[in-house]
Amino acid sequence: MRFDEFIMERMGYPWGENEPDKQTRRQAFLVFRQRTGRVDFASLPTMHRWFGLEKYHRPSRQAVFQMAFAMGLDREE
């Protein structure tokens, strides 16, 4: 599972059969920003790539841990 699929599902936007369109990805990104208190884990263009808004880029391990703590995810998630 790619990170964009994982994080979008956590934000309440499951993929289903087809990849979501850009508008759905943007909505998931905005929910993510709200849930994390608008913390800048990286630059905005980089975070957009985590959601596949322009290109795709997987976040660093450190950024993933920071996001997990900010969202209150448990160890298994």
Place the predicted regions along the sequence by residue:
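Short C-terminal boundary/hinge segments that cap the last helix of small helical domains
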Residues: 72-77
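Recognition helix of helix-turn-helix/homeodomain-like DNA-binding domains
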Residues: 38-59
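Alpha-helix N-cap/N′ positions at the starts of helices
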Residues: 2, 6, 42, 59-62
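A short, Lys/Arg-rich alpha-helix, primarily the initiator
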Residues: 1-35
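Short, basic-rich loop-to-helix N-cap that marks the start of a DNA-contacting helix
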Residues: 54-70
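A broad structural signal for alpha-helix termini and local helix breaks/kinks
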Residues: 11, 36-40, 71
